[in-house]
Each structure stands twice: as structure tokens, then as C-alpha cells.
């Protein structure tokens, strides 16, 4: 699942490549430069998410993409300890704000941990290769 998530996020972040100069090479498109505003997959995947008061409220577990590669949903793991008892919830991808703090990616969401804990839970279904409602989450 981590590989699929990283691949999906790589595709997502690569959509800004339209701004870069492109050189055609057969069926592939090679780039002679990359957009200076581009962000890496690791700026998002497995990164902490904070509320407006700088309290950690969760961690990015996955990003879901539209067929055109546009990100639409972020799965955030909230609660639990070392993964045990954690609940995965879905939020609109564009509701997460990305900035830099101390030269590191800093993700914020305009909500609090309790709101995320009370949101509907999701679980990854490997047979469908996507996230589905988790009717057993609290």
C-alpha cells in the first residue's frame, strides 16, 4: 500500500510539470528543468497534520486521485498510539494547507482532533485498491 500511495502522490505532484520546459523523446516526455514551486511526495506522505493552534491532529496516510491525476482526498490517521487504535478519516485534499516551518514541510487543517475522531472512519480495501467506509470504527 505504501508503494501505491507514493506512486499516486508522485503522479499528483507531477501534474505541475506543465510549467516546465519539455523535450519530446518518442513516447516519453523528458524535462530539462522542473518547476521551482514543485513539492516532493515526502512533503505530504506520512507527514504530521496540525490544527490552527499548532497541535498535532493526525498524519497523512494516503492521498486519493481523480482519474486525471488531480488530488481530491487525503486520508488522515488520527488517535491511537504507534498505529494501535488509530482511526483513518477522509478530508478534502485542498483543505490542507502546506507551508514551510523551520525549513520543513508543515501541514495544517482548520479543524481539531476531536472533530477528526468523530468523523466517519475508512479502511483500505486491497481487493478494490481504494479506501471504503469502516463500519466498525468509532
Annotate each predicted stretch with a short phrase.
Residues 2-11, 15-138:
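Peripheral interaction segments used for macromolecular assembly
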